[in-house]
């Protein structure tokens, strides 16, 4: 899988490529993007839109929401719901998606990680 460079795992001991090898369903992809150079913010949003146009058409895609940190923080959080890790693997290896990645500005750091819901009785359902 090609990643936006520089690529920084959220958990060094359990990187994204390893997560993609685990069968799980449904799941959420959280991708933290840090736009190190503020001048690259518009370019980041343009590249994100182009990649999202491909991702949102992939089998197994459920929904997506991009959030920007408040204040002057250069951090974005992308929350994507998928029906399975198999769907995420296929989408991230799609040639049309991979072709969009070089458009991300070089100062953008991506940190993807996969999650599943956890049940907490009385508060959260899984």
Question: In which residue ranges do the predicted regions lie?
Answer:
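An amphipathic, aromatic/His-enriched active-site/gating alpha helix that lines ligand/cofactor pockets
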Residues: 1-16, 20, 53-62, 81-116
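Short, well-ordered beta-strand segments in beta-rich or mixed alpha/beta enzyme
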Residues: 26-35, 65-94
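Short, surface-exposed ligand-recognition loops at beta-strand->loop->(often short) alpha-helix junctions
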Residues: 34-46
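Short amphipathic alpha-helical/adjacent loop interface patches that line ligand
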Residues: 48, 52
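Conserved beta-strand termini and adjacent loop/short-helix elements that scaffold enzyme active sites
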Residues: 67-69, 115-118
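Short, low-order "capping/linker" segments at domain edges
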Residues: 117-126
């Amino acid at each position: 899988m090609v990643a936006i460079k520089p690529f920084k795992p959220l958990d060094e001991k359990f990187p994204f490529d390893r997560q993609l090898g685990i069968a799980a369903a449904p799941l959420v992809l959280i991708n933290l993007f840090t736009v190190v150079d503020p001048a690259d913010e518009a370019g980041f949003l343009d590249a994100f839109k182009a990649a999202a146009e491909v991702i949102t058409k992939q089998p197994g895609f459920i929904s997506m929401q991009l959030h920007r940190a408040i204040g002057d923080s250069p951090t974005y959080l992308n929350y994507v719901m998928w029906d399975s890790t198999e769907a995420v693997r296929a989408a991230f290896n799609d040639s049309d998606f991979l072709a969009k990645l070089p458009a991300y500005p070089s100062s953008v750091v991506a940190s993807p990680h996969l999650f599943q819901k956890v049940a907490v009785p009385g508060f959260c359902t899984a």
